[in-house]
Amino acid sequence: MKIFHLCWTLVSLFSLLVAADDINLESKVVDTEDAAKIIQASTSSHTNNWAVLVSTSRFWFNYRHMANTLSLYRTVKRMGIPDSQIILMLADDIACNPRNAFPGTVFNNMDQAIDLYGDDIEVDYRGYEVTVENFIRLLTDRWDENHPRSKRLLTDENSNIFVYLTGHGGNEFLKFQDAEEIGAYDLAHAFQQMYSKKRYNEIFFMIDTCQANTMYEKIYSPNILSVGSSRIDESSYSHHSDMDVGVAVIDRFTYYTLDFLEKVEKNSNVTMDKLFAEYTYENVHSNPGIRTDLFHRDVNEVLLTDFFGNVQEVILDDVENGVLETISSVPQSSKASDNATHYEALMATYSDGGYKTKQLHHVTKKEAKIITAVSAVALGLLWTFAKP
């Protein structure tokens, strides 16, 4: 019987040696600071996302421009940007227009599958509030103290901003409601003021209008990626009409933008170059342009969610201190900084009161294998030598 016990002990000891051989003795623990650097090296360094969506047209025959804007509004909301961080500027004269055969609705497709206007929209500037002055004041935050916070672009140096314009334009200008124009230099200077006032980390500027590319040619501020629907002396075209509505319901450039984005989820790793690949002449019927010289990252490294989505909070386990620390936090509301302050005060209270945090050790599969083998050896030895 003792021979059997001895054999059992030897087998257990062999299992212990095999398990020990699998262990990498040179394994290295990466601390939280290094982990944060690894994460930030491959992603944008922004901490919050905003969207400015503007339809500069009015009147019934410009139905498609409002549909363009509401379509992108629906997309960025689906991707995670909250209404509190979306500024929507519309003439808002389509849904309740007496010519509308479907009162209170706006569609972007002839199948009328989605009512863009009925999806709990929040219009920040409507009707005659959609002016060049208000648009520039919005970008530069030049308001008096009584201006509502809900109608301000409350960005900072860590903000990624998606700016979308659609309407009627020409060579280096875009019309606002057939009453005034914003020029390419006006837009460029507004972006420069934003940069000087540290109001953005990166900007993605998209414009869908005739001769759209001329509107981004004068921009000179860094970290701005631009795309337009047509080059100089080219028109931008609508995609199709709805015979029941009686007018065109969406433009070609925005249609193919949405067609691609509808396949993208909020946690997707799809990059911007994949979207740009959709802007072919066969699709758009014009020559879209992309300006990347002011942008510091390659478009094949820029995630669509860097601008169309909302960055999420990442929490890493500090192995050394045993404390959960927020490495990259994107506030979902104005209470985020208050929560951080409360957390610091709470930790200070624990420290002053003599409390100590104990590191929780998570057993790996290899460690579990070793523990099992050691236990088996111990039991085998006890079984072998404990009996007379």
Regions found by a protein language model. Give the residues of each.
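Classical eukaryotic N-terminal signal peptides for Sec-dependent ER targeting/secretion
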Residues: 1-11
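Cysteine endopeptidase catalytic domains of the caspase/legumain-like
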Residues: 16-388
